[in-house]
Amino acid sequence: MKLHDSLAENKSIRLQAEAETWQDAVKIGVDLLVAADVVEPRYYQAILDAVEQHGPYFVLAPGLAMPHGRPEEGVKKTGFALVTLKKPLEFNHEDNDPVDILITMAAVDANTHQEVGIMQIVNLFEDEENFDRLRACRTEQEVLDLIDRTNAAA
């Protein structure tokens, strides 16, 4: 499942969202995936439990988090949700706080998680200017166009 296709088909983009805590921010992304029938509601608690156990493992770069759980924790099919926050939040990551871009990922197996999910995110943000381009997006179509341009350049 391609990032662009998943976001478009699942209508799982939320821009300039308001959240008080990192948990609220994660829930916005998971709720988009629940609404699209990509994950079960329990996926949210699984992510919170993993953070309690391992720390903020999904904060990948300055400003960027990729919340995700394990396939057996309620994943029905592979999919993505993209959330930008109006106000960046602390995720308690010593290097990469605060976070204002979240790409929530659900993968049906570890191979899909590594090869499909993470590689597409790395590809999108290989050009560091895409962080600011994404923050500037105000419509779902602008996000999808940015992803298309990035894929065309790759």
UniProtKB/Swiss-Prot annotation:
Primary location: cytoplasm
Gene3D superfamilies membership: Mannitol-specific EII, Chain A (3.40.930.10)
Keyword Kinase annotated: yes
Pfam annotation, one family: PTS_EIIA_2
Cellular compartment(s): Cytoplasm
Keyword Phosphoprotein: yes
Domain characteristics, as noted in the entry: The PTS EIIA type-2 domain is phosphorylated by phospho-HPr on a histidyl residue. Then, it transfers the phosphoryl group to the PTS EIIB type-2 domain.
Function: The phosphoenolpyruvate-dependent sugar phosphotransferase system (sugar PTS), a major carbohydrate active transport system, catalyzes the phosphorylation of incoming sugar substrates concomitantly with their translocation across the cell membrane. The enzyme II UlaABC PTS system is involved in ascorbate transport.
Protein name, entry field: Ascorbate-specific PTS system EIIA component
Provenance organism: Shigella flexneri
